Amino acid sequence: WKGYRLPQYDIDAVRENTHKAPTWLHFGAGNLFRAFPAVLAQRLLTAGLSDTGIICCDGYDEELIDRCYRACDHLSLVVTLYSNGTINKEVVASVTESLKLSEDMLRLTDIFLAPSLQMISFTLTEKGYIIQDDTREFLPDYKHDRENGPEGCQSFFGKLTALCLERCRAGLSPLALVSLDNCSDNGTRLERAVRHMARAWQRGGFITEDEYYFLLKKNTFPLSMIDKITPHPDNRIADKLAADGLENAKPFVTEKGTHAAVYVNSESPHYLLIENAFPNGHPALEQCGVIITRRDIVEKSAMMKVSTCMNPMDTALGVFGCMLGYTRISDEMKDAELVNLITRLSEQEAMPMVADPGVIDPEAFLHEVLGERYPNPFLQDSPQRTATDTSRKIAPRFGTTLYAYYNSMLPAHRATKLIYIPLVLAGWLRYLEGVDDNGSEFTLSPDPNIEHVRALMGNPKLGDDVSEAQLYPLLANRYYFCLLYTS
């Protein structure tokens, strides 16, 4: 284990304590969870600030539970990649148990009925909170649960709401349900999914008004802002780890399309702010760098990142990188035109409308993104990853800034003067053709709405003369563009 940082606590004792008196349950067993929340829990254990770890559960890609957790005795290897080429390797043992939502409802019920339980966190990805299709019809499994009540739920949010209901009926303290997903208003999205389910049950006579009140008003849904680039596992890192003697280091892709490995690789910079709304207490996260603060500060921090200082550039580098044949974000940062695009997009158009949270300096944050994080050659992030699910990201990443320009009274801040934001939006439409700048077809990144948005555009081909009228059905579609498009 030379060169590896090992757990500095009694792993067996932590597992026993957590099984008997769990405090933290997490849904979503992917790479971000292993690289960030699990490491935070390890820091608390190492410092003696906690004697329990995290129990994780996955309901989307349960193959991860078998291959990344149970096969490794719930030990995970976290590799931190610094811009100077330094690599830090740490064995993380804070995850004490892993569960499958489809098989382990009895164990999950036991956990929810533990008086010690304080918080439930989530990394579901942005699309994980979607409960309705583009016609506002509820998705089939969600609709089934709304109509049939808490027994025999099929959907993730049906099962989650039913578990919270069990805790309510046992007379136990409410919980904080904390979304740690990289999207705006993440806590509100989580609350909305639970509210739609609980209201349907209340109206259908399955639960009482008091139970509905507990689910939505006693439980809390704090907002958070999370930031830590965690790309797919890198084969170069796998080779280094295999040379150290790590078995089965080669990355794999699950049947659901998740890129995973027995290790995770991520960058060093990280940020996490959580709204201070914990009805039953919380782990001492503030002792390891997490900012627990007012809701408005979290909102401004999230808006700063999602709408100004990072996520819009993610989209720009994603769609243009795919069309230009790049496979690494760090290589894109050697392209003067792309650097010019994201620099002007952020500094000239986004920053004038930035929300300043007061606890993070937007200028310093942006400088770190442009000068250190994106150019990091050892962090093999790809435009193909950042272009994933772009149809879900256009409105939150560009809408806030565009609204600010539309509402501005200053002549210098007119939406009609914008250049780079419209260019990125146009770039996404061009990307949807699936043809690069050499005229060769490329595979579009996963996005549940690809076929629909292409159909709304009329499926144009490279070189076609596309009119505004042809694009109008997509640009005017509120599901994708909210109110971004005006004639």
Predicted regions and their residues:
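Substrate/ligand-engaging "lid" and interaction regions
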Residues: 1-27, 31-487
